[in-house]
Protein backbone atom coordinates (compact mmCIF):
# COMPACT_ATOMS: atom_id res chain seq x y z
CA UNK A 1 0.00 0.00 0.00
CA UNK A 2 1.38 3.43 -0.95
CA UNK A 3 1.24 6.14 1.69
CA UNK A 4 1.23 9.92 1.32
CA UNK A 5 2.98 11.32 4.40
CA UNK A 6 3.42 15.03 5.02
CA UNK A 7 5.74 14.59 8.00
CA UNK A 8 7.60 11.35 8.76
CA UNK A 9 10.80 9.84 10.14
CA UNK A 10 12.59 6.77 8.82
CA UNK A 11 13.59 5.28 12.14
CA UNK A 12 16.31 2.83 13.09
CA UNK A 13 17.85 1.93 9.72
CA UNK A 14 21.45 1.57 8.60
CA UNK A 15 22.10 4.47 6.24
CA UNK A 16 24.63 3.81 3.47
CA UNK A 17 25.26 6.97 1.46
CA UNK A 18 28.44 6.47 -0.55
CA UNK A 19 28.41 10.04 -1.84
CA UNK A 20 28.93 11.42 1.68
CA UNK A 21 30.73 8.44 3.19
CA UNK A 22 27.94 7.69 5.66
CA UNK A 23 27.50 4.14 6.92
CA UNK A 24 25.75 3.69 10.24
CA UNK A 25 22.47 3.92 12.09
CA UNK A 26 20.84 7.20 11.18
CA UNK A 27 17.25 8.44 11.16
CA UNK A 28 15.92 10.63 8.35
CA UNK A 29 13.21 13.25 8.89
CA UNK A 30 11.13 14.20 5.84
CA UNK A 31 8.62 17.06 5.88
CA UNK A 32 6.63 18.26 2.87
CA UNK A 33 8.69 16.00 0.64
CA UNK A 34 12.05 17.45 1.70
CA UNK A 35 14.75 15.93 3.90
CA UNK A 36 14.92 18.19 6.96
CA UNK A 37 17.27 16.30 9.28
CA UNK A 38 19.61 13.30 9.33
CA UNK A 39 20.90 12.03 12.65
CA UNK A 40 21.02 9.32 15.26
CA UNK A 41 17.85 8.73 17.29
CA UNK A 42 15.83 11.72 16.09
CA UNK A 43 12.77 12.68 18.14
CA UNK A 44 9.43 12.11 16.41
CA UNK A 45 7.74 15.30 17.71
CA UNK A 46 4.48 14.50 15.96
CA UNK A 47 6.00 12.98 12.82
CA UNK A 48 4.79 9.60 11.60
CA UNK A 49 7.40 6.98 12.43
CA UNK A 50 8.24 4.57 9.61
CA UNK A 51 10.08 1.71 11.27
CA UNK A 52 13.08 0.61 9.18
CA UNK A 53 14.94 -1.18 11.95
CA UNK A 54 17.18 -3.95 10.58
CA UNK A 55 16.88 -2.40 7.10
CA UNK A 56 19.43 -0.76 4.81
CA UNK A 57 18.55 2.80 3.80
CA UNK A 58 20.21 4.23 0.68
CA UNK A 59 19.86 7.11 -1.73
CA UNK A 60 17.21 6.23 -4.29
CA UNK A 61 18.45 3.28 -6.34
CA UNK A 62 19.03 3.96 -10.04
CA UNK A 63 18.58 1.26 -12.68
CA UNK A 64 20.45 2.59 -15.71
CA UNK A 65 19.29 0.10 -18.38
CA UNK A 66 15.72 -1.07 -19.04
CA UNK A 67 13.09 -1.21 -21.79
CA UNK A 68 10.12 0.78 -20.60
CA UNK A 69 7.68 1.47 -23.42
CA UNK A 70 4.90 -0.81 -22.25
CA UNK A 71 3.40 -2.76 -25.16
CA UNK A 72 6.19 -1.93 -27.61
CA UNK A 73 7.60 -5.07 -29.21
CA UNK A 74 8.54 -8.06 -27.10
CA UNK A 75 10.28 -6.05 -24.40
CA UNK A 76 8.31 -3.01 -23.26
CA UNK A 77 7.29 -3.01 -19.60
CA UNK A 78 5.61 -0.56 -17.24
CA UNK A 79 8.43 1.48 -15.62
CA UNK A 80 6.83 1.26 -12.18
CA UNK A 81 7.28 -2.53 -12.16
CA UNK A 82 11.09 -2.28 -12.16
CA UNK A 83 10.93 1.17 -10.55
CA UNK A 84 9.02 2.02 -7.38
CA UNK A 85 7.54 -1.49 -7.44
CA UNK A 86 11.07 -2.83 -6.92
CA UNK A 87 12.43 -0.30 -4.43
CA UNK A 88 14.00 1.79 -7.21
CA UNK A 89 13.32 5.52 -7.62
CA UNK A 90 14.95 6.21 -11.01
CA UNK A 91 14.86 4.07 -14.15
CA UNK A 92 16.50 4.69 -17.51
CA UNK A 93 15.11 3.48 -20.81
CA UNK A 94 17.83 2.19 -23.13
CA UNK A 95 16.68 3.13 -26.59
CA UNK A 96 13.02 2.15 -26.88
CA UNK A 97 12.49 5.48 -28.62
CA UNK A 98 14.35 6.92 -31.54
CA UNK A 99 13.71 10.55 -32.43
CA UNK A 100 10.36 9.66 -34.03
CA UNK A 101 8.91 8.11 -30.85
CA UNK A 102 10.44 10.32 -28.21
CA UNK A 103 7.45 12.65 -27.85
CA UNK A 104 5.12 9.65 -27.54
CA UNK A 105 7.43 8.17 -24.91
CA UNK A 106 7.49 11.41 -22.97
CA UNK A 107 3.72 11.86 -23.01
CA UNK A 108 2.69 8.28 -22.27
CA UNK A 109 5.58 6.89 -20.21
CA UNK A 110 7.61 9.65 -18.57
CA UNK A 111 4.65 11.80 -17.54
CA UNK A 112 2.47 8.95 -16.28
CA UNK A 113 5.06 6.98 -14.29
CA UNK A 114 5.41 7.30 -10.53
CA UNK A 115 9.10 6.46 -10.97
CA UNK A 116 11.50 9.05 -12.39
CA UNK A 117 12.18 8.02 -16.01
CA UNK A 118 15.20 9.10 -18.07
CA UNK A 119 16.15 8.11 -21.63
CA UNK A 120 18.87 7.07 -23.97
CA UNK A 121 17.67 8.05 -27.42
CA UNK A 122 18.16 5.29 -29.99
CA UNK A 123 20.52 6.06 -32.86
CA UNK A 124 18.05 4.31 -35.17
CA UNK A 125 14.82 6.03 -36.12
CA UNK A 126 13.11 2.68 -35.52
CA UNK A 127 14.15 2.49 -31.88
CA UNK A 128 12.62 -0.60 -30.32
CA UNK A 129 9.66 -0.89 -32.68
CA UNK A 130 10.91 -4.00 -34.48
CA UNK A 131 12.14 -5.86 -31.43
CA UNK A 132 15.47 -7.69 -31.22
CA UNK A 133 17.25 -9.38 -34.08
CA UNK A 134 16.50 -6.84 -36.81
CA UNK A 135 19.03 -4.78 -38.74
CA UNK A 136 17.84 -1.45 -37.40
CA UNK A 137 21.00 0.37 -38.55
CA UNK A 138 21.68 -1.42 -41.84
CA UNK A 139 20.10 1.30 -43.98
CA UNK A 140 21.92 4.67 -43.71
CA UNK A 141 18.55 6.43 -43.96
CA UNK A 142 17.60 5.01 -40.55
CA UNK A 143 19.95 7.49 -38.89
CA UNK A 144 18.83 11.11 -39.14
CA UNK A 145 21.35 13.32 -37.38
CA UNK A 146 19.37 16.52 -37.76
CA UNK A 147 16.23 15.08 -36.20
CA UNK A 148 18.19 13.36 -33.43
CA UNK A 149 19.90 16.63 -32.54
CA UNK A 150 16.56 18.46 -32.49
CA UNK A 151 14.97 15.75 -30.31
CA UNK A 152 17.86 15.85 -27.84
CA UNK A 153 17.88 19.64 -27.59
CA UNK A 154 14.12 19.66 -26.98
CA UNK A 155 14.36 16.96 -24.31
CA UNK A 156 17.61 17.68 -22.48
CA UNK A 157 15.83 17.22 -19.16
CA UNK A 158 15.32 13.49 -19.79
CA UNK A 159 17.97 12.51 -22.36
CA UNK A 160 21.19 11.09 -20.91
CA UNK A 161 22.87 9.70 -24.03
CA UNK A 162 22.61 7.85 -27.34
CA UNK A 163 21.99 4.09 -27.50
CA UNK A 164 23.59 2.01 -30.23
CA UNK A 165 23.49 -1.76 -30.70
CA UNK A 166 26.98 -2.66 -31.94
CA UNK A 167 26.29 -6.13 -33.31
CA UNK A 168 26.53 -7.58 -36.79
CA UNK A 169 22.80 -8.22 -36.77
CA UNK A 170 21.92 -4.60 -36.03
CA UNK A 171 24.63 -2.93 -38.14
CA UNK A 172 24.20 -5.15 -41.20
CA UNK A 173 25.85 -4.00 -44.41
CA UNK A 174 26.70 -0.61 -42.89
CA UNK A 175 29.38 -2.22 -40.74
CA UNK A 176 31.02 0.28 -38.40
CA UNK A 177 29.69 3.39 -40.15
CA UNK A 178 26.83 3.88 -37.63
CA UNK A 179 29.39 3.94 -34.82
CA UNK A 180 31.27 6.74 -36.56
CA UNK A 181 28.02 8.67 -36.97
CA UNK A 182 27.10 8.07 -33.34
CA UNK A 183 30.53 9.29 -32.24
CA UNK A 184 30.10 12.56 -34.12
CA UNK A 185 26.60 13.04 -32.71
CA UNK A 186 27.78 12.39 -29.17
CA UNK A 187 30.59 14.91 -29.57
CA UNK A 188 28.31 17.56 -31.08
CA UNK A 189 25.63 17.13 -28.41
CA UNK A 190 28.11 16.52 -25.57
CA UNK A 191 26.33 13.38 -24.40
CA UNK A 192 27.74 9.85 -23.98
CA UNK A 193 27.14 6.74 -26.03
CA UNK A 194 25.63 3.61 -24.47
CA UNK A 195 26.84 0.67 -26.54
CA UNK A 196 25.37 -2.84 -26.49
CA UNK A 197 27.94 -5.57 -27.14
CA UNK A 198 27.35 -9.28 -27.66
CA UNK A 199 25.53 -10.92 -30.59
CA UNK A 200 22.71 -12.47 -28.56
CA UNK A 201 19.96 -12.51 -31.21
CA UNK A 202 21.13 -12.91 -34.79
CA UNK A 203 23.36 -16.00 -34.73
CA UNK A 204 23.95 -15.90 -38.50
CA UNK A 205 25.53 -12.45 -38.41
CA UNK A 206 29.30 -12.06 -38.22
CA UNK A 207 30.11 -10.77 -34.72
CA UNK A 208 31.61 -7.33 -34.33
CA UNK A 209 34.95 -7.40 -32.51
CA UNK A 210 34.79 -5.41 -29.30
CA UNK A 211 38.14 -3.84 -30.15
CA UNK A 212 36.61 -2.31 -33.28
CA UNK A 213 33.73 -0.94 -31.21
CA UNK A 214 36.01 0.55 -28.57
CA UNK A 215 37.88 2.61 -31.17
CA UNK A 216 34.85 4.88 -31.29
CA UNK A 217 34.37 5.31 -27.54
CA UNK A 218 35.69 8.06 -25.29
CA UNK A 219 35.82 8.75 -21.57
CA UNK A 220 32.29 8.71 -20.17
CA UNK A 221 30.87 6.40 -22.83
CA UNK A 222 29.39 3.16 -21.52
CA UNK A 223 29.69 -0.45 -22.63
CA UNK A 224 26.74 -2.52 -21.47
CA UNK A 225 26.62 -6.33 -21.10
CA UNK A 226 30.21 -6.57 -19.87
CA UNK A 227 29.61 -10.16 -18.69
CA UNK A 228 28.01 -11.45 -21.88
CA UNK A 229 28.99 -14.93 -23.09
CA UNK A 230 27.95 -14.15 -26.66
CA UNK A 231 30.31 -13.39 -29.56
CA UNK A 232 31.63 -9.84 -29.46
CA UNK A 233 32.23 -9.77 -25.69
CA UNK A 234 35.21 -8.67 -23.62
CA UNK A 235 37.07 -12.00 -23.62
CA UNK A 236 39.20 -13.65 -26.29
CA UNK A 237 38.86 -17.41 -27.06
CA UNK A 238 41.34 -18.16 -24.24
CA UNK A 239 39.26 -16.33 -21.65
CA UNK A 240 41.57 -13.33 -21.50
CA UNK A 241 40.52 -9.72 -21.83
CA UNK A 242 41.16 -8.31 -25.26
CA UNK A 243 43.95 -5.71 -24.78
CA UNK A 244 41.72 -2.99 -26.21
CA UNK A 245 39.31 -3.52 -23.29
CA UNK A 246 41.93 -2.74 -20.67
CA UNK A 247 43.09 0.31 -22.62
CA UNK A 248 39.55 1.62 -22.97
CA UNK A 249 38.86 1.24 -19.25
CA UNK A 250 42.08 3.04 -18.37
CA UNK A 251 41.03 5.85 -20.72
CA UNK A 252 37.70 6.35 -18.96
CA UNK A 253 35.26 4.13 -20.85
CA UNK A 254 32.72 2.83 -18.32
CA UNK A 255 31.42 -0.72 -17.93
CA UNK A 256 27.85 -1.69 -17.01
CA UNK A 257 26.50 -5.13 -16.10
CA UNK A 258 23.22 -5.06 -18.08
CA UNK A 259 21.98 -8.46 -16.80
CA UNK A 260 19.07 -9.08 -19.17
CA UNK A 261 17.65 -12.29 -20.49
CA UNK A 262 20.92 -13.16 -22.29
CA UNK A 263 23.87 -11.19 -21.00
CA UNK A 264 24.96 -12.07 -17.46
CA UNK A 265 27.08 -15.21 -17.42
CA UNK A 266 28.69 -16.16 -14.11
CA UNK A 267 31.66 -17.94 -15.73
CA UNK A 268 32.43 -14.90 -17.87
CA UNK A 269 31.96 -12.62 -14.86
CA UNK A 270 34.48 -14.58 -12.80
CA UNK A 271 37.05 -14.48 -15.60
CA UNK A 272 36.61 -10.74 -16.10
CA UNK A 273 36.72 -9.98 -12.38
CA UNK A 274 39.74 -12.24 -11.84
CA UNK A 275 41.57 -9.99 -14.32
CA UNK A 276 40.73 -6.96 -12.16
CA UNK A 277 38.21 -5.38 -14.52
CA UNK A 278 35.27 -4.21 -12.44
CA UNK A 279 31.85 -2.78 -13.29
CA UNK A 280 31.15 0.91 -12.89
CA UNK A 281 27.40 0.35 -12.81
CA UNK A 282 24.88 -2.40 -12.15
CA UNK A 283 21.64 -2.62 -14.13
CA UNK A 284 18.93 -5.13 -14.91
CA UNK A 285 18.30 -4.62 -18.63
CA UNK A 286 14.81 -5.23 -17.31
CA UNK A 287 11.89 -5.93 -19.62
CA UNK A 288 8.71 -7.94 -19.92
CA UNK A 289 10.56 -11.17 -20.63
CA UNK A 290 12.81 -11.31 -17.54
CA UNK A 291 10.80 -9.93 -14.61
CA UNK A 292 9.80 -13.46 -13.55
CA UNK A 293 13.43 -14.58 -13.91
CA UNK A 294 16.29 -14.64 -14.28
CA UNK A 295 16.47 -10.90 -13.53
CA UNK A 296 13.55 -10.15 -11.16
CA UNK A 297 14.68 -6.66 -10.12
CA UNK A 298 17.68 -4.44 -9.36
CA UNK A 299 18.12 -5.57 -5.72
CA UNK A 300 18.35 -9.20 -6.89
CA UNK A 301 20.91 -8.24 -9.54
CA UNK A 302 22.91 -6.40 -6.86
CA UNK A 303 22.79 -9.52 -4.69
CA UNK A 304 24.18 -11.60 -7.56
CA UNK A 305 27.18 -9.29 -7.67
CA UNK A 306 27.57 -9.79 -3.93
CA UNK A 307 27.65 -13.54 -4.57
CA UNK A 308 30.46 -12.84 -7.06
CA UNK A 309 32.49 -11.17 -4.31
CA UNK A 310 31.36 -7.56 -4.04
CA UNK A 311 30.39 -6.08 -0.68
CA UNK A 312 27.03 -4.54 0.16
CA UNK A 313 28.63 -1.10 0.21
CA UNK A 314 30.15 -1.63 -3.23
CA UNK A 315 26.89 -2.63 -4.90
CA UNK A 316 25.03 0.23 -3.21
CA UNK A 317 27.68 2.61 -4.55
CA UNK A 318 27.23 1.17 -8.06
CA UNK A 319 23.45 1.63 -7.92
CA UNK A 320 23.51 5.15 -6.47
CA UNK A 321 26.43 7.56 -6.80
CA UNK A 322 28.13 5.62 -9.63
CA UNK A 323 24.86 5.37 -11.55
CA UNK A 324 24.39 9.13 -11.17
CA UNK A 325 27.88 9.65 -12.60
CA UNK A 326 27.11 7.39 -15.56
CA UNK A 327 24.06 9.53 -16.28
CA UNK A 328 25.74 12.88 -15.69
CA UNK A 329 23.19 13.61 -12.94
CA UNK A 330 25.35 13.90 -9.82
CA UNK A 331 23.79 17.26 -8.90
CA UNK A 332 20.36 15.69 -8.41
CA UNK A 333 20.73 11.92 -7.94
CA UNK A 334 22.74 9.43 -5.91
CA UNK A 335 22.75 11.11 -2.49
CA UNK A 336 20.58 12.11 0.49
CA UNK A 337 20.95 15.72 1.68
CA UNK A 338 19.13 18.03 4.04
CA UNK A 339 17.06 20.48 2.01
CA UNK A 340 16.77 18.18 -1.00
CA UNK A 341 13.67 16.23 -2.11
CA UNK A 342 13.37 12.83 -0.47
CA UNK A 343 14.68 10.23 -2.92
CA UNK A 344 15.33 7.13 -0.84
CA UNK A 345 15.36 3.34 -1.11
CA UNK A 346 14.93 0.93 1.78
CA UNK A 347 16.13 -2.68 1.47
CA UNK A 348 16.28 -5.71 3.69
CA UNK A 349 19.55 -7.65 3.76
CA UNK A 350 18.69 -11.29 4.38
CA UNK A 351 21.35 -13.73 5.55
CA UNK A 352 20.21 -16.91 3.82
CA UNK A 353 21.30 -19.30 1.12
CA UNK A 354 19.62 -19.13 -2.26
CA UNK A 355 20.42 -20.25 -5.79
CA UNK A 356 21.37 -17.39 -8.10
CA UNK A 357 20.73 -18.09 -11.80
CA UNK A 358 22.44 -16.38 -14.72
CA UNK A 359 21.19 -15.78 -18.27
CA UNK A 360 22.34 -19.20 -19.48
CA UNK A 361 20.77 -20.99 -16.48
CA UNK A 362 24.11 -21.36 -14.78
CA UNK A 363 23.81 -21.34 -11.00
CA UNK A 364 25.77 -20.08 -8.05
CA UNK A 365 25.12 -20.44 -4.34
CA UNK A 366 24.49 -17.05 -2.77
CA UNK A 367 24.48 -16.37 0.95
CA UNK A 368 22.90 -12.93 1.10
CA UNK A 369 19.74 -11.62 -0.54
CA UNK A 370 18.54 -8.04 -1.02
CA UNK A 371 14.80 -7.47 -0.88
CA UNK A 372 13.06 -4.13 -1.54
CA UNK A 373 11.05 -2.69 1.34
CA UNK A 374 10.22 0.89 0.26
CA UNK A 375 10.89 3.39 -2.49
CA UNK A 376 10.37 6.97 -1.31
CA UNK A 377 9.86 9.92 -3.61
CA UNK A 378 9.01 13.23 -1.97
CA UNK A 379 5.94 12.64 0.25
CA UNK A 380 5.09 9.16 -1.01
CA UNK A 381 6.27 5.90 0.52
CA UNK A 382 5.81 3.09 -2.03
CA UNK A 383 5.72 -0.57 -1.11
CA UNK A 384 7.13 -3.14 -3.59
CA UNK A 385 5.00 -5.18 -5.94
CA UNK A 386 4.76 -8.89 -5.21
CA UNK A 387 7.12 -11.07 -7.21
CA UNK A 388 8.41 -14.57 -6.51
CA UNK A 389 12.10 -13.89 -5.99
CA UNK A 390 14.59 -16.73 -5.46
Residue ranges and their predicted role:
Residues 268-349:
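His/Asp/Glu-enriched, well-ordered alpha-helical/loop segment
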Residues 44, 52-112:
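Metal-associated gating/positioning segment near the N- to mid-region
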Residues 341-390:
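C-terminal cap of metal-dependent C-N hydrolases
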Residues 1-9, 13-58:
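Histidine-rich, glycine-flanked metal-binding segment
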Amino acid sequence: MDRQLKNFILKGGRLIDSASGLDGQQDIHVRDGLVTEIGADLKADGATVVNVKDCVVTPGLIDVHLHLMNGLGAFGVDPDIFGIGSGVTTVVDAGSAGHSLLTVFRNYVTRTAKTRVLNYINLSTLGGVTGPGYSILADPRLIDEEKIEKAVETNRDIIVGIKIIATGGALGAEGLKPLARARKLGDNLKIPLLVHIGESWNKDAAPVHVGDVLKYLRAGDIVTHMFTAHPGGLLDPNGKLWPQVRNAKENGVLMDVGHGLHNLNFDVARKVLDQQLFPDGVSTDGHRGNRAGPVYDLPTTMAKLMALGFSLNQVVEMATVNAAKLLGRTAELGFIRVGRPADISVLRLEEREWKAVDSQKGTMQARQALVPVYAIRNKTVYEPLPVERP
